[in-house]
Amino acid sequence: MVVIPENVFAAMREHAREEAPNECCGLVVLRDGVAERYERGRNRLASPYRYELEIDPEIWFVEDDGYELAVFHSHPETEPIPSRTDQELSGLWGGRTFLIYGVKLDQLRAWQITRESF
């Protein structure tokens, strides 16, 4: 289970709305399953259907301090359910929590990535 405090969710929502109609992406820094902050990334593809996360590589070092990182992206027009494209790209993020925000529905959902499915 992942807990997203309102201030972190607000930052994620704001980023998604700013980037619409394209997908946005970033990382959520978690401690013991609770989100402490959202780190904006850049969608290198600038696409409404796909994303390629570009982010400061230094953020990955927070894992050395006991934090976890969850991968976040938005679906501007569709439900926050992993798409076929998301499933194809999931191998990049194996073992991480996958957060998807549906902009139109104002809904955030969390998924756990496995080799077989979400």
Identify the meaning behind each predicted range:
Residues 1-68, 77-118:
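Conserved beta-strand-loop surface patch within small alpha/beta domains used
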